[in-house]
C-alpha cells in the first residue's frame, strides 16, 4: 500500500516539516489531514527558509500534488496570504488543492477564541487564539461552514444567517461584544470563494484514484500525539486528532491503506502553552537548549518550554500511532551538553509507574525518574554517515530506541535537507 503517515511523537514542533520536505521528493501526493493555521512547519531548502501554517510541505516539488484534507480547518485569509507569498518567492502552487469538505475558520471563531481565553483568566489553556478550537466546536455542533459552501451563494447566506443568530447572542449577551454583520461576513465569504475557486476540489475521489494507481502518498500530520483530544494531556491539547488514525478520517481513506507510520521525535522535549510536562527544565540547562535551538513558536513566537527526552511519553506515542519507524531531529543541539538525561519512568504518589496517566492533574504530580548518559561535546552538524557519529551520540539514540520500542530510520543534525543521516 502506498500511504505513509508522518506524525509528531511529542507535543508538536518536532520537525515534521523538514521530514516531509525530505521525503516528498519521492512522493506523488502530500496531504495535510488535521489542525489549522495553529500549526507551523519550518522548511529550509535551496529556495530559502519558509514558515508554512496551512499549505502542505511538499509544495516545493513541482511534480507533487498537495492537498489540504477535510480534517483541516481553514482560515481563507491565511491560506491566500501564504499562497501569495510562495508565488512571490517563485514557488509553483498550481498543484495545491483544498477539500470542499474542509471547514472554515471565520471571524467570529477568532473573536470567540480570544474572549474565551480571557474569561478563563489564570486557568487559560494557552491556545493560539486563531479560532481553531471554536471552528472545530462548530463542526461537531453542526454549525460549521465548509469550503465548498463558498461556491454556493444562496446556501451560504442561508447558513450564515442561521449561525450568526446564535453567535451574536453569545457575543452580545455573554461577552458584551459587538455583533457580527451578516452582510459584511457574507461579502467577505463571496470574495474568498472567488479567490479559492481554482483550488477547491472533491479530494476524496482524487485520493481514491491515486491509491488505485499505486501512487505514493504522504499524510502530513500537524501538532503531536501528546496533544490529541483523546490520548493527550486533556484539556491542554488540540481540537483534532494528530494521530495516524486521525489521518484516515482527515483525508478520507480506510486504515488498511496506510502501509507505514513514521514518528518524528526531537532529541529533547518541547511544549508551547499550558499543561503538564514532567521533564520540564526550569533551570540554566533549559535556557541553554532554548537559546541554542532558537526554540520559539513558528505560529505564536512564544518561547517553548524545554525538557529532557520523555521515554514514557514516547513509548505511549509509538503505541497509539502504531509507529513502524521513527526519525530523531535536532540531535546536534545536544552537542553542547556534558551530560544528558532520559526519563525512563515516573514516580506518582510514591509509586514507580511506566505508563502515561490519562488525568492531567495526575501527570502534573509525576516526578521523572532519570537515567543519565554522558554527552559527546563535539559538533555533529557535518557528520553524514551514522557510523561517524560520536559513540556517546549513538548510545543515546540506541537507548531511546529501546525505551520507546521503535527504531530510528534517520537522524537530523541540522535544519537543511543535507543535514540528515540515514541508518
Curated annotation (Swiss-Prot):
- Record-listed E.C. numbers: 6.3.4.4
Kindly state which reaction or reactions the protein catalyses: IMP + L-aspartate + GTP = N(6)-(1,2-dicarboxyethyl)-AMP + GDP + phosphate + 2 H(+)
Q: What positions does the entry give for Mg(2+) binding?
A: 13, 40
Per UniProt, which keywords does this protein have? Cytoplasm, GTP-binding, Ligase, Magnesium, Metal-binding, Nucleotide-binding, Purine biosynthesis
Per the annotation, how and in what number is the cofactor bound? Binds 1 Mg(2+) ion per subunit.
Q: Mind listing the GO molecular function terms for this protein?
A: adenylosuccinate synthase activity; GTP binding; magnesium ion binding
Cellular compartments per GO CC = cytoplasm
> What SMART domains does the database record attribute to this sequence?
Adenylsucc_synt
Give the UniProt subcellular location, in the record's own words.
Answer: Cytoplasm
A single GO BP annotation from the record?
IMP metabolic process
* Active site residues according to the UniProt entry: 13 (proton acceptor), 41 (proton donor)
At which positions is IMP bound? 13-16, 38-41, 128, 142, 223, 238, 302
Q: In which pathway does it act?
A: Purine metabolism; AMP biosynthesis via de novo pathway; AMP from IMP: step 1/2
User: What EC class is this?
Assistant: ligase
Which annotated residues bind substrate? 298-304
Pfam families, A to Z: Adenylsucc_synt
Residues recorded as binding GTP, renumbered to this chain, are 12-18, 40-42, 304, 330-332, 412-414
UniProt-listed PANTHER family: ADENYLOSUCCINATE SYNTHETASE (PTHR11846:SF0)
Assembly mode: Homodimer.
- Record's protein name: Adenylosuccinate synthetase
Organism taxonomic ancestry: Bacteria, Bacillati, Chloroflexota, Dehalococcoidia, Dehalococcoidales
Q: Per UniProt, what is the name of the gene that codes for the protein in this document?
A: purA
Amino acid at each position: 500500500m502506498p500511504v505513509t503517515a508522518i506524525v509528531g511523537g511529542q507535543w508538536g514542533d518536532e520537525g515534521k516539516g523538514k521530514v516531509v520536505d525530505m521525503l516528498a521528493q519521492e512522493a506523488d501526493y502530500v496531504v495535510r489531514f488535521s489542525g489549522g493555521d495553529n500549526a507551523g512547519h519550518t522548511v529550509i531548502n535551496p529556495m530559502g527558509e519558509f514558515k508554512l501554517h496551512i499549505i502542505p510541505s511538499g509544495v516545493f516539488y513541482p511534480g507533487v500534488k498537495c492537498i489540504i484534507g477535510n480534517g483541516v480547518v481553514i482560515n481563507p485569509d491565511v491560506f491566500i496570504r501564504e499562497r501569495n507569498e510562495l508565488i512571490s518567492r517563485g514557488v509553483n502552487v498550481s498543484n495545491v488543492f483544498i477539500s470542499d469538505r474542509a471547514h472554515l475558520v471565520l471571524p467570529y471563531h477568532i473573536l470567540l477564541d480570544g474572549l474565551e481565553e480571557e474569561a478563563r483568566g489564570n486557568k487559560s489553556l494557552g491556545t493560539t487564539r486563531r479560532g481553531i478550537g471554536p471552528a472545530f466546536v462548530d463542526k461537531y455542533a453542526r454549525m460549521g461552514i465548509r469550503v465548498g459552501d463558498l461556491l454556493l451563494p444562496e446556501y451560504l447566506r442561508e447558513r450564515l444567517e442561521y449561525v450568526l443568530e446564535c453567535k451574536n447572542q453569545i457575543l452580545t449577551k455573554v461577552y458584551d461584544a459587538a455583533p457580527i454583520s451578516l452582510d459584511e461576513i457574507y461579502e467577505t465569504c463571496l470574495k474568498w470563494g472567488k479567490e479559492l475557486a481554482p483550488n477547491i476540489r472533491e479530494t476524496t475521489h482524487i485520493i481514491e484514484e491515486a491509491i488505485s494507481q499505486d501512487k505514493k502518498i504522504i499524510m502530513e500530520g500537524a501538532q503531536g500525539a501528546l496533544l490529541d483530544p483523546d490520548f493527550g494531556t486533556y484539556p491542554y491539547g488540540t481540537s483534532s486528532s494528530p494521530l495516524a488514525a486521525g489521518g484516515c478520517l482527515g483525508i478520507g481513506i480506510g486504515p488498511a491503506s496506510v502501509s507505514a507510520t513514521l514518528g518524528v521525535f526531537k532529541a529533547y522535549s518541547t511544549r508551547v502553552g499550558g499543561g503538564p510536562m514532567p521533564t520540564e527544565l526550569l533551570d540554566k540547562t533549559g535556557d541553554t537548549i532554548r537559546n541554542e535551538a532558537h526554540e520559539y513558536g513558528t505560529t505564536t513566537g512564544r518561547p517553548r518550554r524545554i525538557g529532557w527526552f520523555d521515554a514514557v511519553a514516547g513509548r505511549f506515542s509509538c503505541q497509539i500511532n502504531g509507529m513502524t519507524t521513527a526519525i530523531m531531529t535536532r540531535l546536534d543541539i545536544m552537542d553542547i551538553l556534558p551530560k544528558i538525561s532520559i526519563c525512563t519512568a515516573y514516580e506518582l504518589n510514591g509509586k514507580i509507574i511506566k505508563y502515561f496517566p490519562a488525568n492531567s492533574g495526575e501527570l502534573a504530580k509525576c516526578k521523572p525518574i532519570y537515567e543519565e548518559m554522558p554527552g559527546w561535546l563535539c559538533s555533529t552538524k557535518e557528520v553524514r554517515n551514522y557510523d561517524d557519529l560520536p559513540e556517546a551520540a549513538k548510545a543515546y539514540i540506541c537507548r531511546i530506541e529501546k525505551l520507546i520500542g521503535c527504531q530510528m530510520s534517520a537522524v537530523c543534525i541540522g535544519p537543511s535537507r543535507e543535514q540528515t543521516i540515514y541508518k
